Amino acid sequence: EEIESLAVNISGIKRIRFFMTFSESYLTHLKCLEDVGMTSIEPVMYGGQEIIPLQFLKTLLPDPASLGPRTKGKTNIGCIFVGKKNGKEKKLYIYNTCDHQECYKEVGSQAVAYTTGVPAMIGAMLVMNGTWRRPGVFNVEEFDPDPFMDALNRFGLPWKESHDPVLVD
């Protein structure tokens, strides 16, 4: 999704990678469910009924909206940029961390929903107030990023910069 449009709309990009991390416990549980077929989307017969294991599993899992009060820890969303500026090799890490419990206190939801909703609201606000307005259809990276980045700071998702971050392959 995001990486496809970024590669098209930002000149000079040679490589984009997207990744997420999960706890060992989460991955172990997911692997166990996968091993017993519960993540399958292929229909199976159960009690004379055809069911899809993943859909059945969904009925047993807690409603995601109920997870907010007990979700703990922080999110970390960031971009690492590697390239040349004025002929010199540069590395820059721009990131935000967001605390699940603080988000729940503020809006009754955990940080994953918060970090999804706030940027969408900011984008809509910039379109509505005319900051991001021109004829046609555009992706956000095709607009001036400064108003968006400033608004992230104002609306609860402050970002930080780390110059010369340590990179992990």
Give the residues covered by each predicted segment.
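C-terminal catalytic/substrate-binding lobe primarily of soluble NAD(P)-dependent oxidoreductases
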Residues: 1-169
